[in-house]
Each structure stands twice: as structure tokens, then as C-alpha cells.
């Protein structure tokens, strides 16, 4: 059996997974299209698509209000909204279709089902919260937080690393497992013709459950981002 080849693009020392890049672009395009469509012809009394958009904004604002000081919440509301939408769409992208090459490589998958992508996303969040902590509180005050109380400094540093790692692995594990089970259900339909109706019903139920779990994971990811950010920028954390 011929080994499945992953489409790659090499630019100097950096190698890009073209499939991952493509589904990321699709994710961004879906988000842009939704926000653009929902924000057209807005009315004083919201209805339909405008109501859906405003509900999402209010929902994410609520996450920020729980973990960020009042005077800082508005500064990060758009960031949290973008993170929530991106993770939610990315989580669900691979649930509804599958495009395989003749070698068996899947060209259509959720970006968040890729561990390298999740680690990169988690690294971005980790660096961002530390940069914001330095920008808001100053380098000395930021480092002081990591060394308070000073006997716990090694544990505080370990906590920063485990936060980064758990943020990525939690997301990857849930989304990857969902796509694996979906693939197994599809294979069940191909096993015998009389299994097709059962596989169809099971797949519909599993897809609905996976969409729910994917949205929960987007909520958890956004909430943890707001939590980590609040610990670095809030004055109350002094």
C-alpha cells in the first residue's frame, strides 16, 4: 500500500502543511463572512442575524467581565470574541465532510485536530498574556508576580508551562477524538449495506454531540485565556 503523502510547502528552513493552511484560511473566511453578513443593515431593535451576533458578543463579554478588571475588559473584548469564534469554527470544520486522496490522506480536517496547531495557538496565548502583563504592569511588577512568594518561584514557573501545555492538549484530545469516532462510524456504513441506516442515525447523533462538545471547548479555551490574562494584567492581582 502506497504511503499517504502530506501536501507540503518549503520556504527556506520552514515547512508548511498546505492542508492545515487551507483549512485555517477556510475558518477565517467563514468567520469573516458570518460577521460581515450579520453586521449589515443593523437596526436599533435587533432581529434575526443581528440578534445572533449581538448574543455572541454579549456572551463573550460576560466571560471577560468575570476575569478582567472593569476598566480593562473592553480593551480585550474583541480579542476574546475573535478567539472564541475561531476556535468554535475550527473545532467543527472537520465534522461534516471528508476529502480523501487516493492514498488515503484526509484533505479536510479541523485545524484544532492537529497537535502542532494547538501547541502554536497555545504558545500565542501564553506569549500574549505575558507581553500584556509587562505592558500593563511593567517588567519588574510582572516578574515580581512570578516570584511571589519567592519559595514558590519554581512552582509558579512550572504552572506557567503546564498552563501552556494543558491548553493545547485539552483542545487537541477532544477534537481529535471526535473526528476519529466520526471516521469509525463512516467505516461502519461501508462495511455492510444493511449497516448504512444504523450508521447514518448514529452519525447524526454523534455529529450533534460533537458540535456541542466543540462549542464547549471553544468556551473553555476562551475562559482560560481570560483567566490567564486577568492574572497578568489586573490591578487586583497585585
Swiss-Prot record:
Its main location: membrane. It is a multi-pass membrane protein. Pfam families: ATP-synt_A. It is found in: Cell membrane. InterPro entries: ATP_syn_F0_a_bact/chloroplast, ATP_synth_F0_asu, ATP_synth_F0_asu_AS, F0_ATP_A_sf. Keywords: ATP synthesis, Cell membrane, CF(0), Hydrogen ion transport, Ion transport, Membrane, Transmembrane, Transmembrane helix, Transport. One of its GO terms (molecular function) is proton-transporting ATP synthase activity, rotational mechanism. CDD domains: ATP-synt_Fo_a_6. GO terms for biological process: proton motive force-driven plasma membrane ATP synthesis. The chain crosses the membrane at residues 18-38, 76-96, 114-134, 166-186, 193-213. One of its GO terms (cellular component) is plasma membrane. Belongs to the ATPase A chain family. Key component of the proton channel; it plays a direct role in the translocation of protons across the membrane. This is ATP synthase subunit a. The gene is atpB.
Amino acid at each position: 500500500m502506497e504511503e499517504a503523502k502530506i501536501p507540503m510547502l518549503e520556504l527556506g528552513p520552514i515547512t508548511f502543511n498546505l492542508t492545515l493552511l487551507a483549512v485555517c484560511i477556510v475558518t477565517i473566511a467563514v468567520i469573516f463572512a458570518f460577521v460581515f453578513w450579520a453586521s449589515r443593515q443593523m437596526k436599533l431593535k435587533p432581529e434575526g442575524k443581528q440578534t445572533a451576533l449581538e448574543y455572541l458578543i454579549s456572551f463573550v463579554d460576560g466571560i471577560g467581565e468575570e476575569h478582567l478588571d472593569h476598566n480593562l475588559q473592553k480593551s480585550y473584548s474583541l480579542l476574546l470574541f475573535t478567539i472564541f469564534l475561531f476556535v468554535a469554527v475550527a473545532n467543527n470544520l472537520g465534522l461534516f465532510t471528508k476529502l480523501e486522496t487516493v492514498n488515503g490522506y484526509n484533505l479536510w480536517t479541523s485545524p484544532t485536530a492537529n497537535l502542532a496547531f494547538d501547541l502554536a495557538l497555545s504558545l500565542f496565548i501564553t506569549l500574549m498574556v505575558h507581553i500584556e502583563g509587562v505592558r500593563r504592569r511593567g517588567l519588574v511588577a510582572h516578574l515580581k508576580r512570578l516570584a511571589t512568594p519567592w519559595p514558590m518561584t519554581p512552582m509558579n514557573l512550572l504552572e506557567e508551562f503546564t498552563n501552556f501545555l494543558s491548553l493545547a492538549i485539552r483542545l487537541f484530545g477532544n477534537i481529535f477524538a471526535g473526528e476519529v469516532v466520526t471516521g469509525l462510524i463512516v467505516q461502519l456504513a461501508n462495511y455492510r449495506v444493511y449497516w448504512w441506516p444504523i450508521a447514518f442515525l448514529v452519525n447524526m447523533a454523534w455529529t450533534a454531540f460533537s458540535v456541542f462538545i466543540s462549542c464547549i471547548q471553544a468556551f473553555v479555551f476562551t475562559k482560560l485565556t481570560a483567566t490567564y490574562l486577568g492574572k497578568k494584567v489586573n490591578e487586583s492581582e497585585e
